Regions:
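Reductase modules of NAD(P)H-dependent flavoproteins
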Residues: 1-7, 142, 147-187
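Short, Lys/Arg- and Gly-enriched loop/turn segments at beta-strand edges
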Residues: 47-54, 97-105
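Ser/Thr-glycine-rich phosphate-binding loops at phosphate-binding pockets of nucleotides
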Residues: 116-121
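Ferredoxin-reductase
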Residues: 2-88, 175-176
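Acidic/glycine-rich phosphate/pyrophosphate-binding loops and surrounding catalytic core
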Residues: 91, 107-110, 124
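Histidine-anchored nucleotide/phosphate-binding helix
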Residues: 122-132
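A structural signal for isolated positions on well-ordered beta-strands in alpha/beta enzyme cores
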Residues: 66, 91, 112, 140-142, ...
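Conserved S-adenosyl-L-methionine
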Residues: 108, 132-139
Length: 187
């Protein structure tokens, strides 16, 4: 039986955070994935399908699918994705990939999650599942960015801090600005 590798998704929302950061929420019928995994997102540009891997930001039970992007200066795909409007089509691989998932982590009490920029996405996917909270005593999320404007999803993080105040710890690093409550520098 032939199974299509790509499925057509529709843009449900395009959130422009800064000139270079944006989030796409996409409605697409894909196979079940594990929190922390990635899939490929693609557009047909000048007759060529250009695809790149992106981590899911949403948990497996949340819809629409959510991806966090940085527009690369020379990036054909990211510079086309940022221009998409609600209802526009995008290609999504039906099957997710990757071993950046909880069941690949050896037994331990605490987990540290370190992400730079959009690299926070797979952690937010994992943190929005019950399994991580049942498994670890302490969960530390570190996000490193260049500027305050790059610190996105702070409301999600604040909700986790309120809900799991004795279990969850968050620390931001900002390299190009001195911001109160953050460490100045890189990780």
């Amino acid at each position: 039986i032939f199974m299509p590798q790509w499925v057509e998704g529709k843009i449900a929302e395009n959130i422009h955070w800064t000139d270079n950061l944006f989030t796409l929420k996409i409605d697409a019928d894909i196979d079940k994935f594990a929190a922390g995994q990635f899939t490929s997102v693609a557009l047909d540009i000048d007759g060529v399908r250009i695809a790149r891997p992106y981590s899911f930001l949403n948990s497996p039970d949340q819809r629409p699918l959510e991806f966090f992007f940085y527009t690369a200066i020379e990036g054909k795909l990211s510079n086309a994705l940022v221009k998409l409007k609600v209802g526009d089509s995008v290609w999504i691989k039906k099957q997710a990939n990757g071993f950046f998932v909880l069941n690949e982590i050896p037994p331990c009490k605490d987990i540290w999650m370190l992400g730079t920029g959009t690299g926070i996405a797979p952690y937010l996917s994992i943190l929005n599942t019950p399994a991580v909270w049942e498994r670890f005593e302490k969960i530390v999320l570190i996000q490193a960015v260049r500027t305050r404007a790059d610190l996105r999803y702070q409301e999600v993080i604040a909700n986790l801090e309120n809900q799991f105040e004795d279990q969850f710890f968050f620390q931001a690093f900002v390299s190009r600005e001195n911001i109160e409550g953050t460490f100045h520098g890189r990780i």
